[in-house]
Amino acid sequence: MEELQRYLEKGRSRQQHFLYPLLFQEYIYALAHDHGLNSSIFYEPVEIISYDNKSSLALVKRLITRIYQQNYLISSVNDSNQNQFLGHNAFFYSHFFSQIISESFAIIVEIPFSLRLVSFFEEKEIPIYHNLRSIHSIFPFLEGKLSHLNYVSDILIPHPIHMEILVQTLQCRVQDVPFLHLLRFFLHEYHNWNSLLITQNKSIYFFSKENKRIFRLLYNSYVFECEFLLVFFRKQSYYLRLTSSGTFLERTHFYRKIEHLPIEHFFVVCRNYFHRTRWFFKNPFMHYVRYQRKAILASRGTHFLMKKWKYHFVNFWQYYFHFWSRPYRIHINHLSNYSFYFLGYLSSLLINSSAVRNQMLENSFLIDTVTNKFDTIVPVILLIRSLSKAKFCTVSGHPISKPIWADLSDSDIIDRFGRICRNLSHYHSGSSKKQDLYRIKYILRLSCARTLARKHKSTVRTFLRRLGSGLLEEFFTEEEQVLSLIFPKRTPFTLHGSHRERIWYLDIICINDLVNHSXLS
């Protein structure tokens, strides 16, 4: 880490980012290896075939040795039969090396982004910790804004069809041309090489979960390009003239040219297309929120305005990124009768009507008031589907045992199930109807009991009778304990005592597979 920090300081002083020499540094691969593989709320850290932490240093050394060998990255295999192509050990090493190299690429590419972020904080004199926003901070924002809006567009941002699009978007911010060529070569070769290991029905290897880090980096660069022009037009809408011939600016030198051009001549892209859509951004009641591929665009305008926005996004992806996006990816609905799925919640607006009796002297009259309330509920069906995928229950929600954990100790089994249950309750603490979570807790509790009974070769009823209430105590969440401190005058909290309280835990800075809409679709 110290050597990496020295390199970052050196790169900051030179203002040039030569990244390709880092590919031959052993500590980069050690950092990628120590970073760990993917984990989620349901799955333990992914274990590659017979992977053992004790052999990590040997594997990293072996990887470096193979990297130094000539033509290692450009070796190709013509045999498409996996059994003939790779034995057990060969598949283990190739799978491991592919993952760790992709992780190393991601770590290296993140360097210029981290430098720019740190310099931005130093220039603006903003403490870094002020930028650490909770994911749950989105929902208080929606609570205050959506109640005054009419329509919402549910947008699913498409993946680029060709990886060259991802490399070109990254080229705007990474100035090391040899490294970009090597990255392009790496993506091309590894896509062809790993395509032999997957069926045609599965997604390409590069977009699989095993390469989540580098995929997230490149995809976020692509999404940033999608949103960059939208944010620019929104901020500058009141400064732009209605008639203009415009000037095309190269995105590679965007930040340098913006300092020398007056704002009235600053029109970023195609004058044949974007000058027709600038008036969209003059609507002050337009709100845009995104997480990963899912975006929400809400407006106080009419259905016609939202329809214009829909085709604006479709044309933007087509002309700027050169790929076709199907219009059905964007759904337009009225907020009063529509529930949209976002960040693991089903959100909607509830209309509350109330009558107030007002009396002035001898006259009295009733005043009917209608207020909108932002409502969030737990998507039980989607949670059960994720539990079924993780082998905790059947598709219908019937709890089953977890045989893969039967070899663990009783305390480890209870701790794993309890941790999953507490994390779920922690994340969905902002739900307005927490009774739905009790079914999920019941599934996990009974699945834990079935796993323990399977381990001890006993029935669930006999095991629960012997264990008593100790198993239930492991599934009490921290939420009841926090609420008992906040509201001490209330009656003691039980398992069902806090279903009316909505609390957004602002210490949540990462989420799990449950909130990823693609994993639940």
Swiss-Prot record:
Matching Pfam families: Intron_maturas2, MatK_N
Family annotation (InterPro entries): Domain_X (IPR024937), Maturase_MatK (IPR002866), Maturase_MatK_N (IPR024942)
Coiled coil listed as a keyword: no
GO annotations of cellular component type: chloroplast
Coiled coil (UniProt feature): none
Primary localization class, coarse: plastid
GO BP field: mRNA processing; RNA splicing; tRNA processing
Gene Ontology MF: a single term: RNA binding
Source organism superkingdom: Eukaryota
Compartments, record wording: Plastid, Chloroplast
TM helices/strands, residue ranges: none
HAMAP family, per database record: MatK
Protein name according to UniProt: Maturase K
Organism: Kniphofia uvaria (Red-hot poker)
